[in-house]
A protein has these predicted regions:
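N-terminal glycine-rich FAD/FM-binding segment characteristic of electron-transfer flavoproteins
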Residues: 1-181
Length: 181
């Protein structure tokens, strides 16, 4: 499963000169670039394991459907849009709780167990890097952040993750199920 977010295209940003706030009107939206990396990683794992499927989930306004359709065109198998006006302005904790609840619902209703949940390291419109780890916590899953390489050992039910950090890299073994950013 891949969590994505539709974000404003930062190459087109304009600020209101009086308030210094982002002018969103007419601003094109894109799939968060870091989430596109997560989708690429999920599709690479799918290619390695026969019978694997990639489901893409996003929380946002109805127009976020366009982001899901883009992911489907790139090879994702299923997509789910979590949308309600009540979610507008949600902080990272509310967002994480809502997405985790949707993941539980998808697992229950589709009788699927997600072994790996992929998230981008952060969204370019917030840069908090909190939603992925908070989803993992809400679901009680192991997590590995700042991953730059991932290999999966299904027989041993673990993943080997190369993580980037300020002093270089480290390689960690993490049990499945796993959330990786």
């Amino acid at each position: 499963l891949v969590c994505i977010k539709q974000v404003p295209d930062t190459s087109e940003i304009k600020l209101d000169p009086e308030t210094n706030n982002l002018i969103r009107t007419g601003l094109p939206s894109i799939v968060n670039p870091y989430d596109m990396h997560a989708l690429e990683a999920a599709l690479a794992v799918k290619d390695q394991y026969e019978g694997s499927r990639v489901t893409v989930v996003t929380m946002g306004p109805p127009q976020a459907e366009a982001a899901l359709r883009e992911c489907l065109s790139l090879g994702a198998d299923d997509a789910a849009l979590i949308t309600d006006r009540a979610f507008g302005g949600a902080d990272t904790l509310a967002t994480s709780y809502t997405i985790a609840s949707a993941i539980r619902h998808i697992q229950r209703t589709m009788n699927r167990e997600f072994q790996i949940i992929f998230c981008g390291k952060q969204a370019i419109d917030g840069d908090t890097a909190q939603v992925g780890p908070q989803i993992a916590e809400e679901l009680g899953m192991a997590q590995a952040t700042y991953a730059c390489e991932l290999s999966v050992d299904q027989a041993a039910q673990k993943a080997i993750v190369k993580r980037e950090h300020e002093n270089g890299y480290e390689i960690v073994e993490v049990p499945l199920p796993l959330l990786v950013t």
